[in-house]
Design a protein with these regions (language model features):
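Catalytic adenosine-cofactor/nucleotide-binding cores of aminoacyl-tRNA synthetases and other
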Residues: 1-132, 199-228
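Short coil/turn segments at secondary-structure boundaries
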Residues: 21-26, 34-37, 139-144, 170-177, ...
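Aromatic-anchored, charged helix-turn/loop surface patch used as a conserved interaction hotspot
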Residues: 115-167
Length: 228
């Protein structure tokens, strides 16, 4: 993988499949990729896996064939027979920033609370360990470009004000829902934008409890950067 990015070091933070995905992208002429790309490569692999097993429907036949072929390639033409338990790497990163002591068991408990997993497994434990290594080693703000219309921006601004208050919020999930409805924004669409801002993905755990877990002020600052 070159002088700076060695496969041995990479495997502290990401799976062998993510290395193969990296190599494929390099072969196809992508920009130079490094450790900072591990979160997006890990989550891209999850998406390829969902496409391969039919959990994500792709109408474009060419894209479907390409995605399925790429998934087989990164699994060395021997893909698993059924979809393994999955957790968003970026979700794990956010949790690893909070939980430093007894990390694996505490994050497993949160993942079960969020209904992200049904039970613990060695594979999930390994993912938590890798995400923990990444969170401890790098401080990378993984922001993506999001097209946000004025109505949604207005609702986001109100949410920022709410999150910046020092008082305890009893039912943040409902408060977020009411802010969206009050600004004539479809709650489902509002939640999707929040996941994009916080996790760079379109879905995630129940948003209210998750925001409280990773810190209201922290999330408020993140959202604030998108509504300026």
């Amino acid at each position: 993988l070159g002088n700076v990015v060695t496969s041995q070091t990479w495997l502290k933070f990401g799976t062998p499949e993510s290395i193969l995905l990296l190599l494929y992208k390099r072969i196809t002429g992508a920009r130079e990729l490094g450790f900072e790309d591990i979160p997006s490569l890990m989550d891209e692999y999850n998406e390829l896996e969902k496409i391969f097993f039919g959990k994500i429907k792709i109408d474009n036949e060419a894209k479907l064939v390409k995605s399925r072929g790429l998934y087989e390639y990164v699994n060395l033409l021997n893909p698993p027979k059924q979809i393994p338990a999955q957790v968003s790497y970026r979700l794990l990163l956010e949790l690893c920033k909070i939980f430093k002591e007894d990390r694996v068991s505490r994050i497993n408990k949160k993942l079960i609370d969020y209904h992200a997993i049904k039970e613990t497994s060695p594979e999930i434990n390994k993912l938590i360990e890798m995400a923990g290594n990444f969170a401890d080693e790098f401080d990378i703000s993984d922001e993506i470009e999001i097209d946000i219309d004025s109505k949604v921006k207005g609702a986001l601004s109100k949410l920022v004000i709410l999150l910046e208050k020092d008082e305890e919020i009893e039912d943040l999930q409902n408060e977020i829902y009411q802010i969206a409805k009050g600004d004539d924004v479809e709650p489902k669409e509002f939640f999707k934008v929040l996941y994009q801002i916080i996790l760079s993905t379109t879905r995630g755990p129940k948003i209210g409890p998750f925001i409280l877990d990773i810190g209201k002020k922290n999330v408020g600052e993140k959202i604030g950067r998108y509504v300026k």
